[in-house]
Amino acid sequence: LFVVLISALFLTISANAVEVKFGHVGKPGSLFSASVDHFAKLANKRLGSKGKVTVFGSSQLGKDKQGMQKLKLGTVNMWLPSSVMASIHDEFGVFDMPFIIKNRKHMNKVEKQVLPGMFKNLEAKTGYKVIAVWENGFRHITNNKRAINTPGDLKGIKLRTPKSKWRVKM
């Protein structure tokens, strides 16, 4: 549904400028890559000589799980994760669940009214600071039996799911 942008609480500071290492798993041309590249372009323009955001895409710094560990260690400063967040804390599972968000207008409302408080609480629990939410498309469940439009439509359907306990529970 949406992807959470995570930042470590501390940045690596060199003698003259701040270096921000920003990792993600997206391949060139993906929404992950386009989003992070655009962020880096805007940030670098504003930072000028004060620092630089360097992007490491295509899992150059590891998969999501390793990226999140590197945030904790301080060897990477920002990470754009995917479904791995639900394994860090249950509340992040909201991003894995289909049928919760009806459309973009609904998501905008949730983003403004619900997520800020949720993320503030999660920072204290997890040590990760969520600084933005970016779209990564809406979740759809597909199969070769019938359309899935409501959770009830899943009855009797066997599916393979990514490693997300909330998707498995559904």
List the predicted regions and their residue ranges:
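Bacterial N-terminal signal peptides
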Residues: F2-T12
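Immediate post-signal peptide segment of exported/extracytoplasmic ligand-binding proteins
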Residues: A15-H24, D37, K41-K52, A124, ...
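Extracytoplasmic "Venus flytrap"
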Residues: K21-H38, S58-K63
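Extracytoplasmic small-molecule ligand-binding "clamshell" domains
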Residues: H38, K45-R46, K52-M78, N103
